[in-house]
């Protein structure tokens, strides 16, 4: 990567040339236009090429491009037909493998200028290593903010592009490499059929799949374009005076809120998350869902809805269905976001004040987002994963019955601990113990099914070891966050809001009901 840093510095960030001419030269055109190769591969060492990913290197990508073309050329010359070998049934496996490797390699190369920009941004900023922040992740800072005098909120589903050409046009704003744009169109048209994936109603499920780096890059470019223009226009409004907002993308360091703004593109992460807050508006987005709340009236929120619909229509040239933006009163509305059931909670604080001989009671009230464990949605997810029935009755997991006893205990215990860690900051966690009970009994039924015994027998046989896999001491977990161990009673731990989960890695069970909320 360092070898090409000097090349990138010659251009402005938004006007740089892509790296494909340096790496692949005429093979891009040969592949896109089905022309013959008249020259041989030029030779260079692996160290001279960009290869910061062990699995997908540019050398392998270039070799696969040549091999795919040669295979296509031989078939066309022998059969004298116009069919493309990429969609030929006899070569489906190789076509899928080649296309996957090439798309992953291209995605890595595309991320290089953005990664360099992010690294330079990180070096210029001082990282605050605070050890006792109440929340250690960005999304939870949003959940703990005091929403004073906020009345209405909009639940927004960001529309997916109806045609892949919209994504290509967005890339044209900052990429001037015509060969790259032709190659992307080639992938869309000839093999991957990305248009079907993009226009699918379950487009968010693509994020759950592996090896979709190129699509994530295209989709993140599309969302970044929307948010860049949205933020630029919103700063011109008298209702949106920004006071504090920030971007949180790190998973290791603890960050405090900052009072300046810098757009950072990071597409190597599978999920990009950021938010900003000010005294007039709250906005947070995760994947394709955004929450917009404001102090303004209901009429102002309707104006924002009309603005967003027109914005997508005239800027991205496709229709934004108005029913994808729901406007509700905060006090009478609960909504799913980031795997939580959120509602507005009123907190009363009564303070006794003494003025001369008179005693006065001062009742103050503030609004706070109440994070509730979505028990019904989690049980539905467990039912889909065959851990329980739709009513929450634990059942065995037959597909795991062939594993060793230790592996079965480890898998069930890992799922239980991950869910407990993720929802540890919820204000009410009683439902979480029900989920743990379902997983624990499902594990016992799976072991009993494997050894053709009863659940009671295995519960007595395993004893403490079985409980150890499912119940982690809270003091041990909290000691990882705080410098000293804090002792909590069971009643207090049910109300304490302590977060210690890596927000970038979301449990698959959480994503399931996010798609259906």
UniProtKB/Swiss-Prot annotation:
Protein name from the UniProt record: Maturase K
Alphabetical UniProt keywords: Chloroplast, mRNA processing, Plastid, RNA-binding, tRNA processing
Family in the record: Belongs to the intron maturase 2 family. MatK subfamily.
Designated gene of the protein: matK
GO cellular component, one term: chloroplast
A GO BP annotation: tRNA processing
GO MF, one annotated term: RNA binding
Provenance organism: Juncus effusus (Soft rush)
Annotated InterPro entries: Domain_X, Maturase_MatK, Maturase_MatK_N
Its job: Usually encoded in the trnK tRNA gene intron. Probably assists in splicing its own and other chloroplast group II introns.
TM stretches of this protein: none
């Amino acid at each position: 990567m360092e070898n090409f840093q000097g090349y990138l510095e010659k251009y402005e960030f938004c006007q740089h040339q892509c790296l494909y001419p340096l790496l692949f030269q005429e093979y891009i055109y040969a592949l896109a236009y089905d022309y013959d190769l008249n020259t041989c591969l030029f030779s260079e060492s692996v160290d001279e090429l960009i290869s910061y990913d062990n699995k997908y290197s540019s050398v392998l990508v270039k070799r696969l491009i040549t091999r795919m073309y040669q295979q296509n050329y031989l078939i066309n010359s022998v059969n004298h037909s116009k069919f493309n070998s990429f969609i030929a049934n006899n070569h489906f496996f190789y076509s899928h493998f080649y296309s996957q490797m090439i798309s992953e390699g291209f995605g890595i190369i595309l991320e290089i200028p953005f990664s360099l920009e992010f690294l330079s941004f990180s070096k210029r900023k001082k990282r605050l290593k605070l050890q006792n922040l109440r929340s250690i992740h960005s999304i939870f800072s949003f959940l703990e903010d005091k929403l004073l005098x906020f009345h209405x909120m909009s639940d927004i589903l960001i529309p997916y592009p109806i045609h892949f050409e919209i994504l290509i046009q967005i890339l044209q704003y900052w990429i001037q490499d015509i060969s790259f744009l032709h190659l992307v169109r080639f992938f869309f048209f000839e093999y991957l059929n990305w248009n079907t994936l993009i226009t699918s109603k379950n487009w968010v499920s693509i994020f759950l799949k592996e090896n979709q780096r190129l699509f994530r890059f295209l989709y993140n470019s599309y969302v970044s374009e929307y948010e860049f223009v949205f933020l630029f226009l919103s700063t011109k409004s008298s209702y949106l005076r920004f006071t504090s907002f920030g971007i949180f993308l790190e998973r290791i360091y603890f960050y405090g809120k900052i009072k300046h703004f810098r757009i950072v593109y990071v597409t190597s992460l599978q999920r990009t998350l950021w938010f900003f807050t000010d005294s007039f508006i709250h906005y947070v987005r995760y994947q394709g869902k955004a929450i917009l709340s404001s102090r303004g009236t209901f009429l102002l929120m309707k104006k924002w809805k009309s603005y967003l619909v027109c914005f997508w229509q005239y800027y991205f040239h496709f229709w934004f269905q108005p029913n994808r933006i729901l406007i509700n009163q905060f006090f009478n509305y609960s909504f799913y976001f980031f795997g939580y059931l959120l509602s507005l909670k009123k907190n009363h604080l009564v303070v006794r004040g003494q003025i001369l001989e008179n005693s006065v009671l001062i009742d103050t009230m503030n609004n706070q987002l109440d994070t509730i464990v979505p028990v019904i949605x989690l049980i539905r997810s467990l039912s889909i994963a065959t851990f329980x029935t739709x009513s929450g009755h634990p059942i065995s997991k037959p597909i795991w019955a062939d594993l060793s006893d230790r592996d079965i205990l480890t898998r069930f215990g890992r799922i239980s601990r991950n869910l407990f860690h993720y929802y540890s900051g919820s204000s009410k966690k009683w439902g979480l113990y029900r989920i743990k009970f379902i997983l624990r009994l499902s594990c016992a039924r799976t072991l009993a099914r494997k050894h053709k015994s009863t659940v009671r027998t295995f519960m007595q046989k395993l004893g403490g070891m079985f409980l150890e896999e499912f119940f982690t001491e809270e003091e041990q977990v909290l000691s990882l966050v705080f410098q000293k161990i804090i002792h909590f009673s069971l009643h207090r731990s049910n109300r304490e809001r302590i977060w210690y989960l890596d927000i970038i890695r979301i449990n698959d069970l959480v994503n399931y009901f996010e798609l259906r909320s």
